[in-house]
Amino acid sequence: MARIAGVNIPDNKHAVISLTYIFGVGKTTAQKLCDATGVKPDAKVKDLSDEQLEALRTEVGKFTVEGDLRREVQMNIKRLKDLGCFRGLRHRHGLPVRGQRTKTNARTRKGPRKPIRK
């Protein structure tokens, strides 16, 4: 297994699909990475040369991925909570943030139903 950005990417899959195993790299970004490094998107990772893998590593290094991206997202949420703005309050209370209805749906965000006490 090749290791890029601290992630073991599968050898037996195409390069584009394997790159999406990295947090922060989707299909479009993976395609751009392959184009920038000259790697054929349909080439298997096990068939790539060491130079191509190294080129992919340096190109991925230019993006914010994995731990840095996770930390950045968490810091953004923490900033909203500290500001006390509406979105921060929704995060703090564990409710949907982007205006979804909560009367009937939002079970994932709200958690399991609580029984009615008498």
From Swiss-Prot:
Which keywords accompany this UniProt record?
Ribonucleoprotein, Ribosomal protein, RNA-binding, rRNA-binding, tRNA-binding
Q: Is Ribosomal protein there in the keyword field?
A: yes
* Extent of the signal sequence: none
Q: Membrane-spanning regions, if any?
A: none
Gene Ontology MF annotations:
rRNA binding; structural constituent of ribosome; tRNA binding
Q: Name one GO biological process term.
A: translation
Q: What is this protein called?
A: Small ribosomal subunit protein uS13
Q: Which organism is it from?
A: Marinobacter nauticus (strain ATCC 700491 / DSM 11845 / VT8) (Marinobacter aquaeolei)
Query: Gene name, please?
Result: rpsM
